[in-house]
Amino acid sequence: MPFSEPGKTKFQVDLRRHLRNQDISDNLVHLICEIAEASKYVINAVRTGDLGVAGTSNLYGEEQLALDVLSDRIIRKRLIHSGVVCNIASEEMDEIFQAQADADGLYSVAYDPLDGSSLVDVNLAVGTIVSIYEGCNLLQKGRNQVAAMYILYGPRVSLVYSVGKGVHEFTMNHLMEYTLSRENVTMKPDGDIYSPGGLRKKYLPETEKFVQHLESKGSKLRYSGGFVPDINQVLMKGKGIFMYPALNGSPNGKLRVLFELNPMAYLIENAGGAATDGKTPILDIEPQSLDQRAPIFIGCSNDVATAMEFMGG
């Protein structure tokens, strides 16, 4: 139920109050609020932290920035001490971390602590992406998520979440509290913007034809190089498509199913959009490993359906 009526001033609704009206468990309310609290420390690190390298590599052989490591530590510590999490997986960790033994009412969390961290030194927007499952199994279909969210650290700090009952945006105010700014965000069937990731000269022929189709119908290119701000643009404008397709030499693209694709697909689908790897809905992929990757086309349902036609899906 909306918290305000047309023509009336909307009073501030904080995140915890909104969650308590979603008919979810107290433990899940607590978990989402703990992640929101952690993000306040992450944004402080982004604004004031070390922009250098950490001297370590993650599971994928990528050099870790000091901000990656610090952001991961902040979120992991909050999850461990929440008391409602059993298993934790992070893009910056080599394996699943067990916070406590399995028990009723616990959740597992997969997250990318600071997606797009290499953009911080040029002062572009970055974000945290979170996927939540009931129980202790993380390697399952994204459709089994009970919640997903991202926090965008841009000119404003915004938190977008869904527990399967609409998609809602909260904005951090001057007191560092998240208050409701948009409720029940929805996608239009068609859009006129596109965000294409990957080097275009490495696109497969079918992907190149799809991009040419988008250009021929007048779609405008809008791409920042950050997954969170680019998805946020598509979602908040309610139109458009983001893609990171299969490439020559990288048939599975770049983005990880568990940490990036599943939570974003969950949010976009709950807003009325769609997400596919070109043949299969992202949320129906059953990951076999933490580092599994897949191509993605995500956004307006008709644009995604057209992408599938070009990909032969």
Swiss-Prot record:
Mg(2+) 1 binds at residues 91, 112, 114. It is found in: Cytoplasm. Belongs to the FBPase class 1 family. It holds the Pfam family FBPase. Its main location: cytoplasm. Its EC number is 3.1.3.11. Its cofactor is Mg(2+). It catalyses: beta-D-fructose 1,6-bisphosphate + H2O = beta-D-fructose 6-phosphate + phosphate. The keyword Magnesium applies. Binds 2 magnesium ions per subunit. Mg(2+) 2 binds at residues 112, 115, 260. One of its GO terms (cellular component) is cytoplasm. Keywords: Carbohydrate metabolism, Cytoplasm, Hydrolase, Magnesium, Metal-binding. SUPFAM superfamilies: Carbohydrate phosphatase. One of its GO terms (molecular function) is magnesium ion binding. The gene is fbp. Pathway: Carbohydrate biosynthesis; gluconeogenesis. Gene3D superfamilies: 3.40.190.80, Fructose-1,6-Bisphosphatase, subunit A, domain 1. InterPro entries: FBPase_C_dom, FBPase_class-1, FBPase_N, FBPtase, Fructose_bisphosphatase_AS, SBPase. Substrate binds at residues 115-118, 223, 254. PANTHER family: FRUCTOSE-1,6-BISPHOSPHATASE-RELATED, SEDOHEPTULOSE-1,7-BISPHOSPHATASE, CHLOROPLASTIC. This is Fructose-1,6-bisphosphatase class 1. One of its GO terms (biological process) is fructose 1,6-bisphosphate metabolic process. It comes from Geobacter sulfurreducens (strain ATCC 51573 / DSM 12127 / PCA). It comes from the Bacteria. The lineage of its organism: Bacteria, Pseudomonadati, Thermodesulfobacteriota, Desulfuromonadia, Geobacterales. The keyword Cytoplasm applies. Homotetramer.
